A protein has these predicted regions:
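C-terminal motif of bacterial Sec signal peptides marking the signal peptidase cleavage site
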Residues: 18-21
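Acidic/polar, low-complexity intrinsically disordered N-terminal segments immediately downstream
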Residues: 25-77, 81-83, 510-564
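Zn2+-dependent metallopeptidase catalytic core
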Residues: 42-181, 188-201, 205-215, 413-419, ...
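Zinc-dependent metallopeptidase catalytic helix centered on the HExxH motif
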Residues: 179-254, 258-261
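Active-site-proximal alpha-helical
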Residues: 262-329, 333-337
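Beta/coil-rich, acidic/histidine-enriched accessory regions frequently appended to metallopeptidases
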Residues: 307-520, 524
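Solvent-exposed, low-complexity, repeat-rich "mucin-like" stalks and linkers
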Residues: 381-384, 512-613, 670
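A short beta-strand micro-motif common to beta-rich folds, especially ectodomain repeats
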Residues: 543, 654-666
Length: 680
């Protein structure tokens, strides 16, 4: 590296020293030496000698070199990577400090760097990213124990990447059959996705943990380790952990990937449920807040058959079941606002995203809907409309083995933990109540009380499922045998019963903040007024979203018909002058309008968008399909209205008031649905 700049700085420092006096000037920090770049082999058709290959002794000759085709079986024939005829050949490779990438022989003499799309890959940038991942997973997360007195195969060998000349998506991180070093198999499309690479290398590290446990005689074989030991038909812990590891590297995707919605729709299920194995990565954030950034890797290093991930976690940190159950509740309460150190700032903008459904049981009581009945380690979050200073009470009655739900099993094992959480208008102030426990010993009853904090803008009730024994969940792809622990609740504020069937609103990707609304039913008109704070709105894809829910039962009573049975021809938009808008410009029934309330298409200067669902959900074409119980918290009891703003028009939206005028045709009569949106 050129050092002329340092000579000049040194002369200036000397001049200052002679002018000012004897005060010693600090020496500049020496820059670390730049490691020499590894020799890059030019693609060639000739055979090579080991001396032609940089770090030849760091490349383990694993079972991949006993294959004649990409997805073929391991054979008894060794296809020497020194020979150009082999599937993988050192003449078609590139190395960095801890990785080597081979591209298969279908690339011929063309570097992936020079190949046209879809076979193109910048191998230098790819290896740089791999090295960045390696450094974080080793030095910070401590998945591999180097220079600690323990042995690791990574002391001797490099990770290997095998790039397939293929357009079919391929991304597989793990290892070959010999249990020595982790590998990654990818096609160019997958290799160009930073999050995918971080996720799959996470699997490679999980495999490496297993290999090193065997090397250090802490496991007898790989089937004893968390990498191979299944809970039923698979192990959710693989995917949960790989997702969390990936979002350590690409934190901007923590809340924007579709797996976030998967978790929000399934948080009532067991932590280890297969339906959310790609989305259930938030407990990991709780672990590292409690025990440090290496907490997750510590669990992986101690997770051995027959313990599942939770049992291993409890064992690693010497937790009793009561202590663990207290953590489950604390974790659930924090999920309401995503109050975890690494993600809390952005998380508050997604507050309340976890969905809940209730069924009116009469006399102010609401039963949890079977589609949201909690399982062990699962939880529910219930948004409440209350004011600061009110005395809030939750009366709770557990209903183990109640009809209409999956069987709970032994009712003596029943347990729930209850409480409240609030978020301030500043989206940073969180307050938590004390928790209350209901078990078979209390006849499954419990009461939680709280004075709503003066700074509370949004409030949720928390119901965490905390049985008195730990219940393992087996991956069997059969939700019918999942053990439900149903309950019913009644809420009062200053002694007045809260109506959970009243409208609810949200603006932060399915939940708590960013919008407020009111509504009235009068004559033949449903009037809704919505206030949206564009500064608090959340981007979801290309849109900034808000929503509100209207209770179907009350709308049905007003219309005299079941609105859920009306088809799209029963709805149409109306211009300000009362004329009919001839067709929908968005999902049916839905409308794009410009800043002047004129209907338009999404690409014609669009600023605003609205569509709505009555007890159903939309497929990608916009058609109404049967409600399946898990669409953003709405369904048989709610009609959801979603409003979007094109992000390019947010500035134009501020200060504007737009009115969406709609007609509903029901049993031969016309009703008006007028929704006024105020953006500020």
């Amino acid at each position: 590296m050129e050092r002329r700049g340092f000579r000049i700085l040194g002369m200036l420092a000397l001049a200052v020293f002679l002018t000012v006096g004897c005060e010693k000037q600090p020496e500049p920090e020496p820059e670390p030496p730049t490691p020499p770049e590894k020799k890059e082999l030019t693609p060639t058709s000739g055979d090579l000698a080991p001396t032609d290959v940089p770090d030849y002794d760091k490349i383990h000759m694993n079972s991949e070199f006993y294959k004649s085709s990409r997805e073929g079986n391991v054979t008894g024939t060794f296809y020497d990577p020194l020979k150009s005829s082999s599937l993988y050949y050192f003449g078609r490779s590139r190395q960095s400090e801890h990785f080597i990438i081979f591209w298969d022989k279908d690339y011929g003499t063309t570097y992936p760097d020079d190949a046209a799309s879809p076979y193109h890959l910048d191998t230098k940038a790819f290896l740089d990213w791999c090295e960045e991942i390696y450094k974080y997973y080793v030095n910070t997360l401590k998945f591999i124990h180097l220079n600690t007195g323990e042995k690791s195969y990574l002391d001797q060998y490099k990770f290997q990447v095998f790039l397939w000349h293929d357009t079919t998506w391929a991304a597989y991180g793990s290892g070959p059959e010999d249990n020595i070093t982790g590998c990654l198999w990818v096609n160019p499309e997958a290799a160009n996705s930073r999050a995918t690479v971080a996720h799959e290398i996470g699997h490679s590290f999980q495999y490496q943990v297993a290999c090193d446990l065997i090397l250090n005689k802490k496991a007898t074989d790989i089937w004893q380790t968390a990498f191979r030991y299944d809970q039923g038909n698979g192990s959710d812990f693989w995917e949960q952990t790989a997702q969390w590891m990936a979002y350590q590297m690409v934190p901007e995707e923590t809340f924007t990937n579709y797996n976030f919605g998967e978790f929000c729709d399934n948080a009532h299920r067991h932590f280890a449920h297969e339906d959310m194995r790609y989305g259930s990565y938030f407990f990991h954030y709780y672990w590292v807040d409690k025990y440090g950034l290496d907490a997750v890797s510590r669990v992986w290093h101690t997770a051995l058959k027959p313990k599942d991930s939770i049992e291993s976690y409890m064992s690693t940190f010497s937790l009793t079941l009561d202590e663990f159950n207290a953590q489950v509740y604390d974790y659930a309460a924090r999920v309401a606002t995503w109050d975890f150190e690494q993600i809390k700032a952005e998380g508050a903008r997604h507050a309340g995203a976890v969905s809940w459904k209730g069924v009116d049981a009469g006399a102010g009581w609401w039963k949890v809907d079977p589609s949201k009945a909690p399982e062990a380690t699962g939880f529910n979050l219930i948004r409440l409309s209350v004011r600061p200073g009110q005395e809030l009470t939750m009366d709770f009655a557990g209903m183990p083995n109640a009809p209409g739900y999956n069987k709970s099993g032994d009712a003596k094992q029943a347990g729930w933990t209850l409480g409240f959480v609030s978020l301030g208008e500043d989206l940073s102030t969180r307050k938590y109540s004390e928790s209350t426990i209901a078990t078979a010993a209390t006849n499954n009853y419990g009461t939680a009380q709280w004075t709503v904090p003066a700074d509370a803008k949004y409030v949720w009730a928390v119901v965490a499922c905390t049985p008195t024994v730990y219940i393992t969940h087996l991956w069997d792809e059969n939700n019918a045998n999942d053990r439900h622990w149903p309950y019913q609740v009644k809420f009062t504020a200053d002694g007045e019963v809260l109506d959970l069937g009243a409208p609810s609103s949200g603006g932060l990707n399915g939940g708590g903040a960013g919008s407020n609304f009111s509504w009235t039913l009068s004559g033949t008109t449903i009037s809704v007024d919505v206030d949206i704070d564009t500064d608090e709105a959340v981007r979801q894809g290309q849109f900034i979203l808000g929503y509100f829910d209207l209770p179907v039962a009350k709308v049905n009573a007003f219309l005299g018909t079941d609105v859920r049975k009306l088809d799209e021809n029963s709805f149409y938009g109306v211009n300000a002058d009362g004329s009919k808008i001839p067709e929908f410009t968005s999902y049916k029934p839905g409308m794009w309008v410009d800043i002047n309330e004129k209907p338009c298409t999404w690409d014609k200067g669009t600023a605003f968008w609205q569509w709505y669902i009555w007890g159903g959900k939309k497929d990608k074409s916009g058609s109404v399909i049967t409600y399946d119980g898990d669409q953003g918290g709405t369904g048989a009891n709610q009609g959801r209205f979603v409003v979007g703003i094109n992000p390019g028009n947010v500035a134009a939206a501020k200060g504007k008031t737009l009115v969406f005028r709609n007609k509903i045709l029901a049993h031969g009569a016309e009703y008006d649905l007028v929704i006024t949106y105020r953006y500020h």
